[in-house]
Swiss-Prot record:
Organism of origin: Treponema pallidum (strain Nichols)
Listed InterPro entries: TraB/PrgY/GumN_fam, YbaP-like
Gene Ontology terms: cellular component: membrane
Record has Transmembrane as a keyword: yes
Subcellular location: Membrane
Protein name in UniProt: Uncharacterized protein TP_0675
Keywords, sorted A to Z: Membrane, Transmembrane, Transmembrane helix
């Protein structure tokens, strides 16, 4: 008994029962909420997975679409050589290009305008740095010098004053010109011109492209130059490989184009030792594709249409941008 004269135990019993009843009610409410929320969470998880962008390969030549929940990223694969046949576009490609909210290329339009002057500064800076180094030509055999002379003429002596990569770039352009494939009539040049005053954004920085051109130390640059000289010694073979690249592009044969692109990359680093080939491919392809994969996913989440034009080799064959997106769960 307490001071009120009422039994303690019945009061305690009622209080405990009341609290137990409240606890049971709360537990029931929580349980009910869980039952209601779980299907919703499951639904959200399904929606999240389903919201990943999907890849569509359109019937138009080397034309893909990454379709996201908010917008689409259309990708036109290109090749660096040129001919009139390559400039015959299907209507849909140009319609999408003209109506796109955003335009992207490997290099943005502003960087394209500034590239020549930036490249010249890099060349001069390198020449001053190697002022006391032996000329590039002194590292080459008589047979290699003959090949350079027949391709570059007297310009090879001027080019020898710069770092070896400069002669390599000049030689590659000369070899392309000898195939009669006019690089001035390529797809990229056409689309830059068609864009007019519209801004084209860059997938890469101008610094990245300079790093690709000037890849390696002096000895490695000479190794890459000699590999290109070896390729140029068989002009018919080189022309045949570029011809195969053009044919696979025109026929929209993505498998063949991926194979030819990979073979050409391997030939320009032929016999390179010490992991040079692996590091070169990482610089010109692997690292860029990884960055593009992230960028394409980001763009697919934006409203509107993004149009991208870039080398088709990055989208065909093994370890393509699309493969990387799938591995990183950025694409269905």
């Amino acid at each position: 008994m307490n001071t009120t004269g009422r039994p303690v135990f019945p009061l305690l019993r009622r209080t405990v029962l009341k609290r137990c009843s409240l606890c049971a009610t709360r537990c029931a409410i929580v349980f009910l909420c869980v039952l209601l929320i779980l299907p919703f969470l499951s639904c959200c998880t399904s929606l999240s997975r389903g919201a990943l962008p999907s890849l569509i390969s359109h019937k138009e030549r080397m034309f893909w679409e990454i379709r996201g929940p908010q917008g689409s990223v259309y990708i036109l694969g290109t090749i660096s050589v040129g001919s009139e046949k390559l400039l015959h576009f299907q209507d849909k490609i140009l319609d999408v290009f003209d109506s796109a909210s955003r335009l992207y290329a490997e290099l943005g339009s502003e960087d394209i305008k500034n590239f020549a002057s930036v490249l010249q500064r890099r060349m001069l800076h390198g020449m001053l740095e190697q002022e006391n180094a032996a000329p590039t030509l002194s590292s080459l055999s008589r047979e290699e010098l003959e090949m350079l002379r027949s391709t570059l003429g007297d310009d090879m002596h001027t080019l020898s004053r710069f770092e070896p990569w400069v002669m390599r770039v000049a030689l590659y352009q000369a070899l392309i010109a000898h195939t009669k494939l006019d690089s001035g009539k390529n797809i990229e040049a056409f689309l830059y011109q068609r864009a007019g005053n519209r801004k084209i954004l860059g997938l890469d920085s101008i610094q990245k492209h300079l790093n690709m051109l000037s890849f390696g130390n002096r000895e490695e640059q000479i190794t890459l130059l000699r590999a290109l000289i070896a390729l140029g010694k068989s002009p018919a073979d080189f022309k045949g490989r570029l011809g195969a690249l053009v044919r696979s592009y025109l026929s929209n044969d993505k498998t063949a184009l991926g194979r030819v692109s990979t073979e050409l990359d391997a030939l320009v680093t032929k016999d390179a030792a010490g992991g040079l080939h692996r590091r070169y491919v990482a610089e010109i392809a692997a690292s860029r594709r990884a960055a593009w994969a992230e960028e394409f996913y980001r763009l697919s989440l934006q409203h509107g249409i993004t149009f991208v034009f870039a080398s088709a080799g990055h989208f065909c064959g093994p370890e393509s941008v699309f493969d990387i997106m799938r591995k990183r769960r950025l694409l269905q």
